[in-house]
Amino acid sequence: MKNTKKVIYAVLFSMCLLFAVNKVNAQPISPHFFGQNAWMPDTIGNASACTEPPCILYGKLHHEWANVKNSGASIIRFGGIAVDKNIPTNYQYIRMIDSIRANGMEPVIQVPFRNYRYNEQQAADIVKFINITSGKNIKYWIIGNEPDLGYSYNQASQIAAYIKPFASAMKNVDPSILIIGPECAWFNQGIITDLTTPNGPYDITGKDGNGHYYIDVISFHTYPFNGSQTRAQVISKLTSSGSLQDNLVYLNSRVSSCNTSHGRNGSSALKTAITEANIDWQNNAADNLYGVGASSFIGGQFWAEMMGISMKNGVDFINFWSVAEGSNSVSNIGYVDASTNTKKPSYYHFQLMAENFKGNYVNGTTNQLNVKSFGSQNSQETAVLVLNEDLTSNYNCTIRLNNTAIAGNSQLKINMNANIAAEFNEVIQSQSTVLFIFNSSGALIKKYEYSLNQNAVANIGPTYTQYGGTTGIEPIKSPAHEGTYFEIAKVFPNPNTGKFTVQLNKENTDELKYVLEVFNIEGQLVYEKNDAPFVKGKQDIDLTFESIASGVYIVRVRLGENIKTTKIVVVK
């Protein structure tokens, strides 16, 4: 019987590969693709009568909402093992929902199960209180957490046995909700296969007796490593056999079969989500920017690659774990450092993509194993992300925006399936990520450079350059009243002798006070002005009286939570 199943899986996998090839080229990116997990809050459950301690977690999530909002996250999951162990109070549910929505994001709410500690009536009561009594109209709901780990369930029958009654009870209260499951701790193929066998004994994708679909989104978690990974493993993992790329291709074949068999289409079509994800669930004790864990630069690039593969395969949303947690380097796996509030490379990679990837996914191919590339495209722009994960190699690169072979001797050749007959040449530094934005004709209009040695070590975000026409960097006109949002339009002259002007893309009509800083290439602060007025959007800087040497410097401008950076070259 086991051999028969293996043959069936092999045939299905071959079929889904064909399905994927036909699907990739025009794969829309979900409008709520970029997600996070609401972890770690201060308290979950009744602290005075905690069922399974601890209920008091001492988390500082309430201080991080501005960071989460500014990262570009759009969908936030309130769930995980803590929510499953100790049912949140009504106040905690509502406070979390209101905090998420106050920052322009949409909540995903988990009801607890904890191996029958909680029942379907309690789940229905939670839906009733939140959606009916409180009028919060939460769309996405999750049942339980990691049944194959937390409950040690190893059979689909065990999971279907609680998913179905919970889903029916919840949808009887509010038929408009969408339910997510089974929330496997990893891509547990055997369990997921049985749960997605149309009309099989454990199928959770069909309808109950009241005509309600049980599950609307098939979900799983992924933490590929445990902290012992090598750099080579990190670079090759996601597209290796049996890893994320293969798993999503296989899952798409299951979902397609369920949609066909159950007549699910349009808004009722079954979808997929990854509701917890990170490079590892714990770091090596020595992990830092130069390591290979959640605090490392390549860890941020790993996040970007996970998002690219997920977009390519039509994942509706991916929620990374987590915002901020951990009191030591092993448990510090959030995208904001819980101790220092420093934004990690994972934060900036997430933000780069969340702010710039729109429309359809665009596939990319490269001729270097240590370089990955992919992008997005809408009617106005094509975004191309290049991840150079090589430790030492700087590459002369040619990017072509279609699949025509690239001539010449460039060390790095990248073809993007964007159907634009245009090429662009650039030097891609080692251990760096570069995002290029082209207009509909294939002309470069924006560039974001984020590298280990120039940005991450200085704890600054990507260096931004905006292009206009053929004469270099030009300012872009924008409304005067845009709150704290701004861009650095240009720095001139550049190169310079230490005297230069920073020009923003808008006039400072509200007389806001900006912070302007200049760092050397080693990340040391060499100049700071805390109340830069930017009269008419311009600020003159004179470093000729400072003891600075010729070289490359980073200019950073801050206003509230908005931070923009760019490079200058000083020649004395």
Positions of predicted regions on the chain:
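Noncatalytic carbohydrate-binding groove/subsite architecture in carbohydrate-active enzymes
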Residues: 123, 156-298, 313
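Carbohydrate-binding surface patches
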Residues: 367-406, 431
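C-terminal beta-strand-rich structural cap/linker in extracellular carbohydrate-active enzymes
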Residues: 423-471, 551
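N-terminal catalytic cores of secreted or lumenal carbohydrate-active enzymes
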Residues: 27-216
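Bacterial N-terminal signal peptides
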Residues: 10-20
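C-terminal outer-membrane/trafficking sorting elements
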Residues: 477-492, 496-572
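Beta-strand-rich binding/interaction modules
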Residues: 392-418, 512-518
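Aromatic/acidic polysaccharide-binding cleft in carbohydrate-active enzymes
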Residues: 274, 279-353, 357, 361-371
